[in-house]
Structures are given as structure tokens and as C-alpha cells.
């Protein structure tokens, strides 16, 4: 099976042309589309002038991990590009990807070791993009930082949630090695709440950052849910990533020779499609309850908002069928195993609700059904049992405008506090949280604060 990355670097001439299309707008809306506030016109201009070392410096000024976002970010900056009003936007993501790769190729990425230590210790719990960003910012600022991860390897979502064909793990490892050289300590295989209690961790460190993600999957409570062969998407992807890493997996979920149905049309669902196809699935069908998105931007989602449009990922290009307006009715099974999914057409009612249309039911054959329906908050009961940390109405870790929770010195960032979101938002929150931790411990900060905890994507509804 070929798990190699499918994304390729644009030809030098094409990159030069795309970077040159950037108009260096007086008000660059691409900044507003990016929660990191990336200096996009600046590094576009530098690429156009073949000054790649300076382009890398300007890119890393706002983004700890451009090699990650250049691969997995949906590029809301491109939706906000002024050129996109009447033509195709600049391919910002491709330029970002190329800068990141050339920087590593040319050995421009060097560890930044602080000249002096502050004398304060910080524990970061969770090693996804938010936790890693916070850890690197604080380590470079002179703090002694330890990152705890319950899995056997560091990386969180980047390690086991995203397939290699989108993000090869060698890309993650080379960045982690830079962080090790800077002084960040990694503690994989340690589950806070079990191996070390949360209250003991708080006593041990001057500050604690909760960056555990939003890992509780959304359920689908319809008849037949107890049948074997129905799995959460992340359970499938995590096992697949372990297999690609040549780990022993005692209970693999294998799509080989099976008719696979993926419920959910987002990035996680797309990753399931590509993974199932590589495993040799007999067929893959993706179902979404909503309408098929339009090809072009809808009037109610004007520029510079990121519109909901019909997208074709590399996984979709590889095969499978996509169905819309499909309401799930019942999991069908025999002898305790799933054999199909009963679906019906979806209707939108005048009151805004939606549901199945009577008389339109049919059964789709399925040996494996994957639930890629999103996530509903933090799954760690130990956190709230061992510390007086509050959860908000969506079961995310509640925090104030300084990212601090109800417990003094305990902060929360990324999906753990924001809820399910994008890698780019997680990095932005990790950077901002680090600034507030520094201010809390020293009374001042030199670190950037790209986003507030309550900030969201561009909203023109007000």
C-alpha cells in the first residue's frame, strides 16, 4: 500500500508566478482570514524576489509550524484573498508549503536556544498542534517546559489522527527534533489523571496548560448501533496510523474487501475514504445529511468569508461515491454484525428542521461503517474530578480572556477550550496562551497574542 504524501511542490516557475500575483494590498484581507495573522504579502513578495531565507524568517515570525499548515490547513486565507473577488486567488497554501520545505532543505531551520532561563516550570498536557506551539514559544522564552502525552509517541492529532498520505510522520519528527534541541522535554506514555493526578501535576509545576483536544466523538443513536463493524472514525484512523508505523495493533479495523460507508463529509471523513481505499476496500460510500454544497460562493457567504463550497480532496479523487441528503434510519445486521445501513432522502421543513422523507427508504450494503460526525468536547473526567476546573455548555474546558481556567495557574488552549476546530486555530491559540502564561508568571510578556479565546473566523452577520 502506498501511504506516501500525495501533495507535491509546485514547479519553481509556477510558484514564482503565483507569488507575483499577490498585489500587496493596502488592507490585506488574507491576514484576517488567517488566525495566525501570517504576513502573507511579505513572504509572497520575498519568494517572487527569490529571497527564500527571508521568506522563511517572515513566515516563522507568526507560525511555529508552517510545514504542518502548508499540508493540512484548508487555507481560509485564500478565501479572503482580494484577487478572489473576480478571479482565482493566489495559491497561498502552495507558496507556504514550498517555503517550509525549502527552509528545511537548505538547513535554514535552526533551534532557538534561550540565552538564560526564567526559573519557572510549565507542564503542557497534550502534544497536538496547540500544545506544541505553546511549548515551543515558552521554551524559547526561557521557561522549563515538559510536554506530557498519553500516547506512545508525541504528536497528538498530527501523529495518529492524520494519515501519512496527508502528513508524513518524518515531517513531524524533524520539527520535534528541533524542539528537543531547544530544550523542550517530551514525556510520552504518561496519562495525566491516571499515572499522575491533575492536582499533583499542578503542585509540581508553576503553571499547567491543558491542550488535550476535543476528543469525544459525536454519537449516532439509531437502532442497530450495537452491531459489530460500526466504529468511530478516529478509532479507525488511529489504528491505521499505528499499522503504517509498523506497530503491533491487537485489534485492527481493516477495510480490505469490505463495503465501507463513511458518515460525515468533513476532513475526517475524507481521511477515512483515502485510508479505506488504500487498505483495499471493495467500495467506499460517503454520506452527508445536508445538501450538496454549491460549486461557487453563495450570496449569503460573501467575500471575505470562507464559503462552504463543494470540495474534492485527494481522497475523493482516488475513488468512492458521495451521497447527499441522506438521512440515516437504522443500522441493519445479521448474527450481531452490520450488513447494511437503511437511509432515506432528507427534507428541509419550514421550521428549519430536517428529517427523512417517508417512502424513500433503501438499504445500502455495508460491512464496515465509520462515524465521522465530529467531536463534542473533552473526554477527561479526571480533570474535573481532580481539579475544580469548569466546563462550558459544550463540555469544553472553560477559560477567561487570558486562557486561564477556574484554577489559578491552569490554562487551556486549542480544541480543549475552543472545541473542534482547525490546526491553524490550535497553533494560534497555543501561541496566545503562551503569552498569557508568561505574563501570569513574570508580570510581562514579549510573546505575540494572535487570537483571543472568544475570537472566531470572519463574521459579517453583526
Briefly describe each language-model feature range.
Residues 54, 116, 121-125, 173-222, ...:
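Feature captures the FAD/FMN-dependent oxidoreductase FAD-binding
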Residues 56-63, 74-76, 95, 158-206, ...:
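N-terminal Rossmann-like dinucleotide/flavin-binding domain of flavoprotein oxidoreductases
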Residues 103-122, 238-258:
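A short, basic/flexible loop-to-alpha-helix module at the beginning of a structural domain
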Residues 121-146, 268-278:
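N-terminal Rossmann-like FAD-binding beta1-loop-alpha1 element of flavoenzymes
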Residues 143-159, 284-294:
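Glycine-rich FAD pyrophosphate-binding loop
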Residues 226-257, 349-420:
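FAD-site-proximal beta/loop scaffold in flavoenzymes
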Residues 269-274, 279, 416-447:
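A conserved FAD-binding loop/helix module that cradles the flavin
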Amino acid at each position: 500500500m502506498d501511504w506516501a504524501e500525495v501533495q507535491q511542490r509546485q514547479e519553481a516557475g509556477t510558484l514564482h508566478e503565483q507569488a507575483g500575483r499577490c498585489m500587496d494590498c493596502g488592507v490585506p484581507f488574507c491576514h484576517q482570514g488567517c488566525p495566525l495573522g501570517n504576513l502573507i504579502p511579505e513572504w509572497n513578495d520575498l519568494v517572487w524576489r527569490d529571497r527564500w531565507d527571508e521568506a522563511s524568517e517572515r513566515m516563522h515570525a507568526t507560525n511555529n509550524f508552517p510545514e504542518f499548515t502548508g499540508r493540512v490547513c484548508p487555507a481560509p486565507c485564500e478565501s479572503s484573498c482580494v484577487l478572489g473577488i473576480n478571479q482565482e486567488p493566489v495559491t497561498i497554501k502552495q507558496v507556504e508549503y514550498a517555503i517550509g520545505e525549502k527552509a528545511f532543505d537548505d538547513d535554514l531551520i535552526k533551534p532557538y536556544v534561550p540565552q538564560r532561563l526564567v526559573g519557572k516550570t510549565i507542564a503542557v498536557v497534550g502534544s497536538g498542534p496547540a500544545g506544541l506551539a505553546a511549548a515551543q514559544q515558552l521554551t524559547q522564552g526561557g521557561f522549563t517546559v515538559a510536554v506530557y502525552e498519553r500516547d506512545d509517541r508525541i504528536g497528538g492529532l498530527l501523529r495518529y489522527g492524520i494519515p501519512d498520505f496527508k502528513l508524513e510522520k518524518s515531517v513531524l519528527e524533524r520539527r520535534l527534533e528541533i524542539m528537543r534541541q531547544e530544550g523542550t522535554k517530551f514525556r510520552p506514555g504518561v496519562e495525566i489523571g491516571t499515572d499522575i493526578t491533575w492536582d499533583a501535576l499542578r503542585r509540581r509545576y508553576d503553571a499547567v496548560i491543558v491542550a488535550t483536544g476535543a476528543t469525544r466523538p459525536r454519537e449516532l443513536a439509531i437502532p442497530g448501533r450495537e452491531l459489530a463493524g460500526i466504529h468511530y472514525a478516529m478509532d479507525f484512523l488511529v489504528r491505521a496510523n499505528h499499522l503504517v508505523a509498523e506497530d503491533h495493533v491487537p485489534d485492527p479495523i481493516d477495510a480490505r474487501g469490505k463495503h465501507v460507508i463513511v458518515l460525515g463529509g468533513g476532513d475526517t471523513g475524507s481521511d477515512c475514504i483515502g485510508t479505506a481505499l488504500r487498505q483495499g476496500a471493495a467500495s467506499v460510500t460517503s454520506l452527508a445529511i445536508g445538501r450538496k454544497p454549491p460549486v461557487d460562493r453563495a450570496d449569503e457567504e460573501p467575500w471575505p468569508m470562507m464559503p462552504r463550497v463543494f470540495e474534492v480532496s485527494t481522497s475523493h479523487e482516488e475513488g468512492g461515491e458521495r451521497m447527499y441528503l441522506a438521512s440515516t434510519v437504522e443500522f441493519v445486521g445479521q448474527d450481531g454484525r452490520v450488513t447494511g445501513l437503511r437511509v432515506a432522502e432528507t427534507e428541509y421543513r419550514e421550521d428549519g428542521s430536517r428529517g427523512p422523507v417517508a417512502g424513500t427508504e433503501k438499504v445500502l450494503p455495508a460491512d464496515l461503517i465509520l462515524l465521522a460526525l465530529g467531536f463534542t468536547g473533552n473526554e477527561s473526567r479526571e480533570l474535573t474530578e481532580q481539579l475544580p476546573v469548569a466546563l462550558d455548555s459544550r463540555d469544553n474546558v472553560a477559560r477567561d480572556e487570558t486562557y486561564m481556567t477556574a484554577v489559578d495557574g491552569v490554562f487551556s488552549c486549542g480544541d480543549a477550550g475552543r472545541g473542534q476546530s482547525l490546526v491553524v486555530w490550535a497553533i494560534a491559540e497555543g501561541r496566545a496562551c503562551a503569552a498569557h502564561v508568561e505574563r501570569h508568571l513574570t508580570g510581562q510578556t514579549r510573546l505575540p497574542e494572535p487570537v483571543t479565546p472568544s475570537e472566531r473566523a470572519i463574521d459579517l452577520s453583526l
